């Protein structure tokens, strides 16, 4: 607004910056570029909601889910599933949906499965809501109609109905009947719940920015316990809960050391790859080719430049979603502009790289000229500095002559209003020392004069020829003939400019949304490049090598492998090799003292295999990975009060998963199974489980068992044959000390060396010596004599007396009363002994 002030001598002054009166809301502080960036980062860390729709019929599964983080519907073509619904369980474990939608008319197996899912208290707070919709909502024809009649921003408005059907048919497999019905039911649920648009007008539909297919056919089966014990993921409490929405951060884990992604969507894709390890050799080889290319010394500068560009790739789906809902922020245009220009930089860089690598070829071809069009439109239309200054969308000059003219008139108001105020002051009472003419959007032009001391009551505010409006900050505001004339002449310039610029913004949004498909593809390929650059960076720093994949090799071969986490925490790390291919040594029994490295070796084998199955280089000189379809572990008990299970019961559940599901191509890692119960029972269970697998012959899984049960070998509880191989951790006794070499070699440990471990733990020397003495006596079959220093006075004599009484007892005497004997003879003597 403009204003004019006059001093008591009634001399008009030049214009000064006006301020809105206290009766009107002041504009919000204008965020600078840094604040806008921080605001965007917070948006990117919003927790996503996933809503899953599932149907199961005649042994086939139809699945579709909506992800609010990218406003995309993901679907899986009809896939066969067992009656136990293992495939559905895998999907649930992977995506953790907030709600599961299905038909009220459902198969008994599905009903039982969902009922069990809803009652799993240990899933809190992630337990999904189970929602049953009428079966009519999943009808095939009505589902097709919903899909074809949907309002999708990625489909141009110029498409005819026939072209729209052909376009959607190229994306959605309409021949997969269960999938189509699941998609239709999901759309019905989204429309009924109005996910993401709960507070919008009813004519605003749920934004859907695309359809994506996902497959689970080539995935390697890994359960949550395995992810936990191998430390593939590890969440820790964040020191500042304000930094992360969930209050958690990644701890020391495989994901933590490999995650060097520069954009949030790269990090998200890396996590997805970790949850979906695959044995698809084509996909794995394509990932390794990119990593190997960037590991070449001459390509280091190119990798760094690409990483810098990827740092500007932001959350495009969130921006497109806000455009769809007309909730675009000022910072969104700048973020989108940087993202598109960075994508163009990626395209130009990849065009100079070898096109024999699939990813470079895809980026060079699919980052089309639509990106240039979007960047050019935004760059020519949006006034970034003006938008940040006014905290709203503004356009550059020479876009709309009418807007430019109104802005010129608005900019010329201060000097014009100075002249108007001078004329108004001439007509006012001489007691009024000064006046100003101000402009307030939506209200118009007003005459503002200071409140005089004589103006006490409301009636004193009346001035002839002026209409009193309001009092604010000791200023009286009036409408005069001239201000009314200004309103009629100039109108509400500010609001008119704003309305016209909003219309231009809407037109620009439509242009961007019409090309949403290319932006979505940009994000997919850029995030893939980001992940592979991150894996290449980790491989370079940690000295990883490229694994080989051989479907003919049944197992894993590792030359001088290392534990990827342990080698970062230890000063020195001893590498170990692994050979478990073919029909020999499919069951490896590893014995050795505590702290000799058995558990680390098991985890090392599991982690190297896992890294190879996500397409990463591995910590080994050489690694050859065969056809592995699952990794099962029984290494650590994930205890929880909410489970209501004992430690041993949890161990049994983990082993049961492996026994029931492991195939000839599975890798099974078992550490100290049976220690949670009686020694004899634990040993018997371990032997029974291993004999069960050995009975399968060549179809036995690849099993690594670490145990301290030396009796398993000494008593020959396992059948002899080429399937069993005994390994031990090499050690050496140096006087009273035990030296660990942490090297795996063939053989069997001679002793557990528990006394050395007890001494290292700080137990008193007397206790350690006594324990060793008792152990030697038991092993040699000799009687154990008590320690005299620990006996009470006359304790041995009292024991002998009690034994003599039992020996003299005549059990055949008909007059014998055992109750009297126990109460009068035994109990008093036992009391004195104890």
Curated annotation (Swiss-Prot):
Keywords: ATP-binding, Disease variant, DNA damage, DNA repair, DNA-binding, Meiosis, Nucleotide-binding, Premature ovarian failure. This is MutS protein homolog 5. Signal peptide: none annotated. Disulfide bonds: none annotated. The keyword Ribosomal protein does not apply. Heterooligomer of MSH4 and MSH5. Interacts with HJURP. Interacts with REDIC1. CDD domains: ABC_MSH5_euk. It is linked to Premature ovarian failure 13: An ovarian disorder defined as the cessation of ovarian function under the age of 40 years. It is characterized by oligomenorrhea or amenorrhea, in the presence of elevated levels of serum gonadotropins and low estradiol. GO terms for cellular component: nucleus. Involved in DNA mismatch repair and meiotic recombination processes. Facilitates crossovers between homologs during meiosis. SMART domains: MUTSac, MUTSd. One of its GO terms (biological process) is chiasma assembly. It comes from Homo sapiens (Human). InterPro entries: DNA_mismatch_repair_Msh2 (IPR011184), DNA_mismatch_repair_MutS_C (IPR000432), DNA_mismatch_repair_MutS_clamp (IPR007861), DNA_mismatch_repair_MutS_core (IPR007696), DNA_mismatch_repair_MutS_sf (IPR036187), MutS (IPR045076), P-loop_NTPase (IPR027417). Widely expressed, with high levels in testis and ovary, including granulosa cells. Also expressed in fetal ovary and adrenal gland. ATP binds at residues 592-599. Belongs to the DNA mismatch repair MutS family. Changing residue 353 to M: In POF13; uncertain significance. PANTHER family: DNA MISMATCH REPAIR PROTEIN MUTS FAMILY MEMBER, MUTS PROTEIN HOMOLOG 5. Pfam families: MutS_III, MutS_IV, MutS_V. Residues 1-44 are annotated as: Disordered. One of its GO terms (molecular function) is mismatched DNA binding.
